[in-house]
Amino acid sequence: MAIRSNALSEMTRFWLQARHGCVVSEAVPVKVPYNYSDIDFLALRPDLTPWTLPDGTPITRAIIETKDEHDFDPKGKDFGRRLKEDVQALSDALYISKPKLAHFSLLRQEHYELATRIFGTADFDRLFIVHALDPDVRNEICPILAKTKRIYWLTVHEIVTDLFQWYQRVSNRAGLRHSLMGDLWHLLVGYCGFRPSE
């Protein structure tokens, strides 16, 4: 039974495991003041060979946060506003120091330090997978975050397109049916012919 129970998390797990051959740990608890937060996914390949983002960026170890608020914020405008606030709080640092709060939890000091302890190194990337992100904010901020802090952003459209392109090359598609998401993908894309929207 999956730990996460929303569509974007299910798709992200499928993308990490089936598409990239990653081993994942999910819902890793993180102690924060007065409560617990979590890291949605930690991911790496067992042999530590890099896997790639859709733009070709190599990733060896990653912590991943998924956020889907498409009913409330279909264009990602609010996510863009929140990201700008978090980037201002980050300033030149690698994380937002406690006790400051962050809209995107992987930017918090507690999450960064726990991932460093788990991986045994600070040599890891942070990946945010969201339903959408304001294109202006993304163009302005995300290249700098990627270059200076190894923080990357993808949308569900990019994940679906990447999965679709990969699926075309899979020789044993029925082998994907061992997971619910793989079975759904094989049924909807393979049998029913669903395609990503342009």
Language model feature labels by segment:
Residues 1-198:
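Intrinsically disordered, low-complexity Ser/Thr/Pro/Gly-rich regulatory segments
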